[in-house]
């Protein structure tokens, strides 16, 4: 009943929104939250709160602490967050510029979040999924893995800026550490770093470079587990346990709650949008 009432109110909320059927990218059925709210309760939980759904697969009485309720917004909060990611005449979402060094970066006076991860971790796909309600956004993708050598800046209306960092690991640019380290250490309006980890292979040696930088500079960061549609359920549960243990025992600045996502099924995407809207100060949620 609650979901039904919310579906009606959300429908009214977005009745004046932009037409989502046009644009260069094809749309998944679940890009818009109004469609997600039509799902039965169990499927809705799996799509919106994937960590909660995974938690249910552990044996009762021996379930690990996955910090499920640190950020657990209401469905209404998640629906409100979607408006920040929906392009309109009054909310322009667009690629802004690229920079090879911090002193080339635009001097913006709005909150900023950055996405960082190994080459082929699915960073570009995740950013496309986050911006799927703004189909005209041109997400910059290198033709060859690891060849992105620039910081790509995306303007999200008047609300915040999303920065796509060069991928590290395989064939990363030689000056990767200097470029990224300078940005992380000196960018004053950086609110949160989103560190992407492939849920198929877990934390790799190359990931420790980014983790160590975040810890050294005392930066608040979040681990996002990508490609959760790829591994088997058993393998995914194993990876979640291992990564959660790492966060709990080896980190100081990492947000305790993991964010599993799939850019293919949109599982976890709506929750991640809501988290970004919250930590950039644009949406006061009941999540915390």
UniProtKB/Swiss-Prot annotation:
Domain EngB-type G: 109-282
SUPFAM superfamilies: P-loop containing nucleoside triphosphate hydrolases
Residues noted as binding Mg(2+) in the record, renumbered to the chain: 124, 148
Cofactor(s) listed in the protein's UniProt record: Mg(2+)
DNA repair as UniProt keyword: no
Cellular component annotations (GO), alphabetically ordered: mitochondrion
Source taxon at top rank: Eukaryota
Keywords (A to Z) from UniProt: GTP-binding, Magnesium, Metal-binding, Nucleotide-binding
Amino-acid positions noted as binding GTP in the UniProt annotation, renumbered to this chain: 117-124, 146-150, 164-167, 226-229, 261-263
Family classification: Belongs to the TRAFAC class TrmE-Era-EngA-EngB-Septin-like GTPase superfamily. EngB GTPase family.
Name of this protein: GTP-binding protein 8
Species: Bos taurus
Highest classification ranks of the organism: Eukaryota, Metazoa, Chordata, Craniata, Vertebrata
Annotated gene: GTPBP8
